Amino acid sequence: MEVIVKKVGELKVGNYIYNEQDGEVYKIVSIETSKPGKHGSAKARIEAISVTSGKKIVIIKPTSDPIKVPQIKKIKGQIIATEKRKVPSPQGEVEEVVAQVMDLETYEVIEAKVPEELKDKVEPGANVIVWDLGVPVVMQVFKQ
């Protein structure tokens, strides 16, 4: 996954940011900026939700500071097979659905995570859009 650097003041609601601490991509839910003080600079308070895990974070930075923004690669593909896996987590074992997706341009097969809200729509033969966020994630399913 490629990242570019932008200033915090250039970000808008709906943009994506890359958090280096946990290596996840977050979607910005809200941004509030404060006025600069007599000797200070304007600050931005960013609330964001992880695209893969749903974790919520709050970042407070000066608007002139740099922040990493991911260049999201979108892949059109077709589901070949799905598989349920048990993954350890802090709440115990969690069941995760992974889909084998064939890229319709290169015919390469990749494994992509399937979010909770799309688990019932995913079936072999369905066309999908996969976002490469460091970890491939199915973001949209098209029924035939």
Curated annotation (Swiss-Prot):
GO terms for cellular component: cytoplasm. The gene is eif5a. Belongs to the eIF-5A family. This is Translation initiation factor 5A. The modification Hypusine is found at K38. It holds the Pfam family IF5A-like_N. SUPFAM superfamilies: Translation proteins SH3-like domain. InterPro entries: IF5A-like, IF5A-like_N, NA-bd_OB-fold, Rib_uL2_dom2, Trans_elong_IF5A_hypusine_site, Transl_elong_IF5A_arc, Translation_prot_SH3-like_sf. One of its GO terms (molecular function) is ribosome binding. It comes from Nanoarchaeum equitans (strain Kin4-M). Keywords: Cytoplasm, Hypusine, Initiation factor, Protein biosynthesis. Its main location: cytoplasm. HAMAP family: eIF_5A. Functions by promoting the formation of the first peptide bond. GO terms for biological process: positive regulation of translational elongation; positive regulation of translational termination. The keyword Cytoplasm applies. It is found in: Cytoplasm.
